């Protein structure tokens, strides 16, 4: 009897242990399904605000728009979370394992992961060689008759020294105009607009200020549309736009000068196992056709 009782107790322990392992395994699988992006669960779509040049370029490059009554309509799914700057976008994606977003390639850091798009890695070199096709211009926008100091700053941006600043900060330079030979005029310059252009503009400001301490430069971060509007109205001397000018803006007297090319990186949380995505999949996610990570293969 004692031997039989011991055997029953032993079997009971084995059964309990087996159940425990099964329960823990189920819990682990459930946890993986709910906490790890790319292995189930809904996609959290994050976009930029209306007026953002990055959003405008993104929807155009990925075809997230339709022509209705002769006008382009943004077809971004209405359940998308909206962020108002590059930094907020990165913070939002880094804090949500199921999130997807997009940012200026020049602003990319290790807090998020950039996906390869159509098999090409998001790098400045791949933009130069044409394999990574998701790119757009960085423009500075002015109206007629800029001040002497504003004109001198623009000459610096376009110079060999200015374009070196662009390249050193992981953007793609445009053809430079040679060595900077400014006259170091004094005065204040107000620069306003795109949060994507702002980081490189801050670096250009620093480099120019070293050469011309007589200039005072104030940078106001907002979005591309605000930058263009402020340049046209005289609120700022230079507008920043991370997109091409609209015909309506040109008709009002806005003039754009390309100072760099930049890619748009499609980003996910670092815990997301996904590394590659196609342009069509990005479009389907942002139009709401695809809603789950299980649908991305």
Where are these regions (language model features)?
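Sec-dependent N-terminal signal peptides of Gram-positive bacterial secreted proteins and lipoproteins
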Residues: 7-35
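Exported/periplasmic ABC-transporter solute-binding proteins
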Residues: 28, 33-297
């Amino acid at each position: 009897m004692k031997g039989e009782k011991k055997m029953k107790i032993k079997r009971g322990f084995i059964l309990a242990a087996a159940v425990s392992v099964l329960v823990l395994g189920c819990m682990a699988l459930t946890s993986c399904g709910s906490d790890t992006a790319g292995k189930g669960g809904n996609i959290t779509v994050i976009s930029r605000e209306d007026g953002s040049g990055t959003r405008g370029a993104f929807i155009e490059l990925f075809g997230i728009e339709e022509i209705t009554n002769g006008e382009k309509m943004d077809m971004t799914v209405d359940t998308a979370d909206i962020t108002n700057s590059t930094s907020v976008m990165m913070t939002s994606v880094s804090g949500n394992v199921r999130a997807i977003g997009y940012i200026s390639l020049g602003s990319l850091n290790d807090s998020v992961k950039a996906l390869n798009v159509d098999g090409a890695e998001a790098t400045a070199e791949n933009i130069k060689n044409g394999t990574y096709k998701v790119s757009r211009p960085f423009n500075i926008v002015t109206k007629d008759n800029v001040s002497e100091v504003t004109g001198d700053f623009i000459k610096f941006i376009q110079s060999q020294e200015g374009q070196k600043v662009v390249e050193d900060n992981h953007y793609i330079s445009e053809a430079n105009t040679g060595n900077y030979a400014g006259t170091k005029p004094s005065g204040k310059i107000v620069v306003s607009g795109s949060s994507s252009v702002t980081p490189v503009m801050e670096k250009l400001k620093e480099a120019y200020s070293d050469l011309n301490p007589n200039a005072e430069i104030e940078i106001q971060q907002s979005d591309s549309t605000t930058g263009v509007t402020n340049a046209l109205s005289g609120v700022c001397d230079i507008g920043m736009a991370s997109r091409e000018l609209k015909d309506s803006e040109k008709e009002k007297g806005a003039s754009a000068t390309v100072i760099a090319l930049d890619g748009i990186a499609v980003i996910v949380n670092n815990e997301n196992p996904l590394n590659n995505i196609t342009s069509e999949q990005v479009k389907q996610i942002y139009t709401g056709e695809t809603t789950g990570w299980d649908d991305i293969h």
